[in-house]
């Protein structure tokens, strides 16, 4: 079984004049780990926290890249050098685990301009774009998989919640009346569609947060140091990268 831990970075809202978002890009990233590596990932995260005197940090929801970089709670007592060292160790942890990386990056301005009022919400569309890429990977390796997501991701998005609910009965159906080139795919290798796990209990989701934020900064701000560090993890076959989708 392959677990795809999902986490997003960026505001899924529309930019002016259609909304109030101040950011152009929305990114959803997924880290695929074999089931047997879950305990290793959990222990590795705890080891890194202990190394930096943070073994008391048991709520993994607080293990967020943006929080560390800003020196916000609970990292306000750590100097910038210690925070950078912590971030370095976590990215090294991700690379050494050798997960398979997937992501979808949506330029919200171009997406809304191209499709107008018919444009899918970035939150929903990012999920729909990443699903078939993970499924094709599972077909290639003859494996089964499941999406793992924090329930907070769907709390304020009724359309995403509906998509996931329907997926449990009929799969992730990628079809649209205004885009006939989308596939009608039920993704039979995905088991139970989405498993919801509180992120404070899942180091996998929080490691996905580090990746999604690094990818978002690459597109939104042109800051690519961390992106380059993890780009080698992208699903690749015969020299072609299949793990990423930039839209439109």
Pin down the residues of each PLM region.
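Phosphate-ester processing/binding pockets and catalytic centers
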Residues: 1-248
């Amino acid at each position: 079984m392959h677990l795809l831990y999902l986490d997003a970075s960026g505001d899924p809202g529309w930019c002016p004049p259609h909304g109030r978002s101040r950011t152009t890009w929305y990114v959803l990233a997924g880290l695929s780990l074999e089931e047997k590596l879950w305990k290793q990932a959990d222990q590795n995260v705890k080891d890194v926290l202990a190394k930096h005197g943070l073994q008391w940090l048991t709520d993994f929801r607080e293990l967020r890249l943006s929080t560390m970089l800003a020196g916000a709670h609970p990292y306000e007592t750590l100097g910038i050098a210690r925070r950078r060292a912590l971030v370095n160790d976590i990215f090294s942890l991700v690379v050494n685990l050798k997960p398979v990386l997937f992501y979808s990056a949506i330029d919200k301005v171009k997406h809304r301009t191209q499709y107008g009022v018919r444009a899918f919400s970035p939150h929903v569309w990012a999920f729909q774009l990443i699903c078939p890429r993970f499924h094709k990977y599972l077909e290639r390796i003859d494996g089964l998989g499941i999406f793992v997501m924090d329930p907070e991701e769907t709390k304020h998005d009724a359309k995403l919640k509906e998509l996931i609910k329907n997926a449990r009965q009929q799969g992730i159906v990628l079809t649209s009346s205004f885009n006939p080139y989308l596939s009608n795919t039920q993704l039979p290798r995905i088991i139970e569609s989405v498993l919801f796990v509180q992120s404070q209990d899942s180091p996998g989701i929080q490691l996905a947060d580090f990746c999604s934020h690094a990818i978002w900064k690459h597109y939104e701000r042109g800051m690519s140091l961390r992106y380059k560090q993890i780009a080698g993890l992208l699903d690749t076959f015969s020299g072609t990268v299949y793990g990423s989708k930039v839209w439109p």
